[in-house]
Structures are given as C-alpha cells and as structure tokens.
C-alpha cells in the first residue's frame, strides 16, 4: 500500500539508476530519491536484555545522511538546472513520517511511503523497483549506503530488478538532452566517466 505526501506551499556520495533512454528536453524529467531512516550517530544504542535486538526506546532517528546530503541534494540541484520533479520514496511504517516531511521541507515536490517494514535489502529493493517501474522515473537516486548497516546493496539490487544501468559511488552528474554523463571514484582516486544512456 502506498501513502502519498505533498509538499506544503509555505515550506530545496549517491548511487544512480537510469532508464535506458532519458526523456528528451520537451518532457518533464522525473527524479526519484530513495530515503531511509537511521539512528542518529550521537544516540546511545542499548540492546534488549537477551542481546538479540537493539532497544529503540529513547533512540533519536534521522534521515540517512547519505540519502539527504548527496542523493536528495543532487536531485534537487538537477531539477533546478533542468526542470522536472523530485519525488521521495521511503519504505517503512507510519512512525517514520518525520524523515519524509523533512525531505519535503528540504525541497522535494512530493513523497510516497510504502507501508511495509523493511525486512532485508532484497525486500526493500523489490518495493522500490515496483514503485519506480509503475511511475516511469528517469533517474533514481540513492545514498551510497546507510550509516547503520553499511550494506550498499539496495541500489544495485533495484537496478537489476529494473534491468536498468547503474553506477555506484557517483561523485558528479551532468545531464544534456537525453544523455547523462557521470564520474565516480575508483581505486587510486582516479575518476571514471560513463555515458549512462549507452550502457
């Protein structure tokens, strides 16, 4: 089940998944940013008495910094340069709405919450892929990893499910017409440039 959120009128390092062909300039570019909720790094984590799970009581949660400062901010910059719309997608329960509303306050046009508890990376990727496919987004932005699990799995899994080109650890993105050119760090601090539309 999807829950949609709209931005209030009185309220701007990532992974990228591309459609095989970007919309031409006459079309509105549709950008999707996937966000997750993570414990604040300043929060003291406690575990249950049997040490099988962490105790969420008293834990301050925030939007994953890689999703906020890299994926969302870069999507908003691209929207400002090229036009289009930015939609936030979050997989999680209603209790996580705070991070969604923060994303809208930062500048996203609208947001969608998949009403499901993330079980693992594959489950989360399947939820993202299903929604992204149904709405035909041009580019999907994700932070390189979450600061709690550091898995770096969801973006690649989502791209595979969408059968779409994927670039991890991107550091720069330029879009011109129906072509996206980007750079990413590789071993030795060299930069790799890729024409995503042709991959």
Task: List where the protein language model places each region.
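Glycine/small-residue-rich loop that forms an oxyanion/phosphate-binding "nest" at active or ligand-binding sites
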Residues: 120-132
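Short beta-strand-loop elements within alpha/beta enzyme cores
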Residues: 135-146
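Conserved small/polar residues in nucleotide/adenosyl-binding loops
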Residues: 192-199
């Amino acid at each position: 089940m999807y829950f949609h959120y709209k931005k209030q009128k009185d309220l701007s390092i990532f992974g990228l998944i591309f459609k095989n062909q970007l919309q031409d300039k006459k079309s509105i570019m549709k950008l999707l940013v996937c966000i997750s909720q993570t414990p604040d790094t300043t929060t003291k984590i406690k575990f249950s008495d049997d040490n099988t799970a962490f105790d969420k009581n008293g834990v301050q949660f925030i939007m994953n910094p890689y999703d906020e400062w890299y994926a969302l901010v870069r999507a908003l910059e691209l929207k400002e340069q090229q036009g289009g719309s930015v939609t936030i997608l979050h997989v999680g329960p209603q209790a996580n709405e705070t991070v969604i509303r923060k994303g809208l306050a930062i500048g996203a046009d609208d947001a969608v919450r998949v009403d499901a508890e993330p079980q693992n990376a594959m489950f989360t990727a399947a939820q993202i892929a299903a929604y992204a496919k149904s709405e035909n987004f041009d580019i999907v932005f994700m932070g390189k990893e979450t600061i709690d699990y550091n898995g770096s799995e969801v973006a690649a899994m989502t791209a595979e499910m969408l059968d779409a080109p994927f670039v991890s650890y991107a550091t720069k993105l330029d879009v011109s017409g129906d072509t996206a050119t980007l750079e990413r760090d590789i071993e030795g601090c060299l930069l790799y440039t890729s024409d995503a539309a042709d991959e």
